[in-house]
């Protein structure tokens, strides 16, 4: 994961908040375009005393100052192509983008490959106990 982690479209804080709880020495930036969600996350941050979490009310494509992150996480944010295009400039050398998806994203992977044949990625199926729906994680390497 590295030490600097960005959670795009954090919403209610998943996966950023649970990861910050179990990784207190890592730095997390949770961003979301919805200010109500940021207000909620600030409440969670204060109540859980999460000093390793920063919050930002912004869209990733509006993040002007180029910060570099070792890992960029997203869940239900956008297509893989959009995720890659909007976040690759914020990824450190040898960093990874980890995108959570439902069913195997055939079309999204094709669109990502059409963007550049040099994009390297792996897809892993995840089994969630008591959940019959498909879940996959796509890891995109810089």
Would you name each region that the model predicts?
Residues 23, 91-93:
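Helix-to-beta-strand junctions that scaffold the AdoMet/dcAdoMet cofactor pocket
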Residues 1-11:
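Conserved class I S-adenosyl-L-methionine
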Residues 37-39, 105:
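Short alpha-helix immediately C-terminal to the canonical SAM-binding loop
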């Amino acid at each position: 994961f590295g030490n600097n982690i960005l959670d795009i479209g954090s919403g209610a804080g998943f996966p950023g908040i649970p990861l910050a709880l179990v990784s207190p020495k890592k730095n997390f930036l949770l961003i979301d375009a919805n200010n109500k969600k940021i207000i909620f996350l600030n409440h969670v941050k204060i109540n859980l005393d999460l000093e390793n979490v920063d919050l930002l009310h912004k869209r990733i494509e509006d993040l002007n100052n180029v910060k570099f992150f070792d890992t960029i996480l997203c869940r239900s944010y956008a297509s893989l192509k959009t995720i890659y295009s909007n976040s690759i400039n914020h990824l450190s050398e040898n960093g990874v983008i980890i995108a959570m998806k439902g069913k195997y994203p055939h079309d999204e992977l094709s669109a990502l490959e059409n963007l550049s044949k040099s994009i390297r990625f792996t897809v892993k199926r995840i089994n969630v106990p008591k959940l019959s729906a498909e879940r996959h994680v796509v890891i995109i390497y810089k």
